[in-house]
Design a protein with these regions (language model features):
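ATP-binding/phosphotransfer module of carbohydrate and carboxylate kinases, centering on a glycine-rich
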Residues: 1-70, 79-83, 101-109, 126-133, ...
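Residue-level detector of high-confidence beta-strand sites
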Residues: 34-36, 89, 158
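A short acidic/small-residue loop/turn micro-motif
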Residues: 38-40, 94, 162-165
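A charged helix-plus-loop insertion that forms the helical arch/lid used to bind
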Residues: 84-95
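General beta-strand structural signal in soluble alpha/beta enzymes
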Residues: 111-115
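Glycine/small-residue-rich loop that forms an oxyanion/phosphate-binding "nest" at active or ligand-binding sites
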Residues: 118
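Glycine-rich phosphate-binding loop of actin/hexokinase-like ATP-binding domains
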Residues: 133-190
């Protein structure tokens, strides 16, 4: 059985806001092949149809080979990972779909799903910085901000599968930045990709000589450009420092919550490493003294961590079902 597990292949589907990625991973965490497909702002049912078309294409007519052991899916929104139900894509669009059952019946394989951040947390547990930890927090700082909590080796999902929405905790940066949730000054409203864009627009009037490009017509401020002008633009410096302080405050609060020995930072805002030392220098060393494995950047490729996470759902789901 162990040799069979080593030879097993796991299919993964990672649905993001702008792209869909389908891939195949071996039991050691190596992506064997993958394919990108266009996505967009979809309803859940339209997204499921897109997933089915992409899988049919990837599998050359929808026929998994004999080595395929399971399908794993990572989705945005709220997921009942126990039953494999996609409960909602966001708080304003709820349409519970039994995605795991539908895909399992279509492709003849067991299917397991979770939201995107908990999926990435599983990838960290299996193949990343969390391999040697039973008490870990993975914090994703990207378009939004959320976290996966591992406590005594178990990933926390919550009573309503909504655990980890830490982006909607207070940032400690009090200048009344509006957040999508309706509260001001959430961490996500200050330090996420969307939050940095919103803050740049709110603060730009104070800095008429800024070098930062503020796009019109639905474009978003480039976080990379904000960081690039940190040394020569006051607006960019304020945006960066506020984001770093908000993330540091979040880390120090979460440390008190679940007592982790490891904290892993990932997501697009953290991916180039520029913000990381600025976060570290704002941490109170006494507060983080028990984080003995450190506060570290993910060592998984940020381009593929979502797909690795989806495949990891398949690995862990198959293990639990055995």
């Amino acid at each position: 059985m162990e040799n069979q597990n080593r030879r097993a292949r796991y299919l993964g589907v990672d649905l993001g806001g702008t792209k869909l990625m389908v891939g195949e991973m071996d039991a050691g965490g190596t992506l064997l092949r993958f394919q990108k497909y266009p996505s967009g702002l979809l309803t859940q049912r339209a997204a499921l149809e897109l997933i089915e078309r992409a899988l049919d294409d990837f599998l050359d007519g929808g026929r998994p080979d004999a080595a395929a052991a399971a399908i794993g899916v990572g989705l945005v929104g709220r997921i009942d990972s126990r039953t494999g139900t996609w409960l909602e894509i966001d708080a304003k669009r709820e349409d519970a779909l039994p995605v795991a059952r539908i895909l399992s019946e279509r492709y003849g394989l067991p299917c397991f799903l979770d939201n995107d951040v908990r999926s990435a947390t599983r990838a960290e547990m299996l193949f990343g910085r969390g391999r040697n930890s039973k008490d870990m927090i993975y914090i994703n700082v990207g378009t939004g901000i959320a976290a996966g909590f591992v406590v005594d080796g178990r990933l926390v999902c919550g009573g309503h599968y909504n655990a980890g929405e830490v982006g909607h905790s207070a940032s400690g940066i009090p200048f009344q930045t509006p957040c999508e949730c309706g509260r001001p000054d959430c961490v996500e409203a200050v330090a996420s990709g969307l939050g940095i864009d919103r803050c740049a627009r709110l603060l730009a009037g104070r800095y008429p000589g800024t070098r930062l490009t503020i796009p019109d017509g639905g474009g978003r401020v480039s976080v990379a450009e904000v960081f690039a002008h940190y040394g020569d633009d006051q607006l960019c410096r304020e945006l960066t420092d506020n984001a770093a302080q908000a993330i540091a405050n979040l880390i120090m609060n979460l440390v008190r919550f679940s007592d982790p020995d490891t904290i892993v930072l990932g997501g697009g805002v953290m991916s180039d490493g520029f913000l990381y030392p600025k976060v570290l220098e704002r941490l109170n060393q006494h507060t983080i003294r028990y984080v003995t494995n450190g506060i570290v950047l993910t060592d998984l490729d940020p381009r593929y961590i979502g797909l690795l996470g989806a495949c990891s759902n398949a690995v862990k789901g198959k293990e639990s079902a055995s």
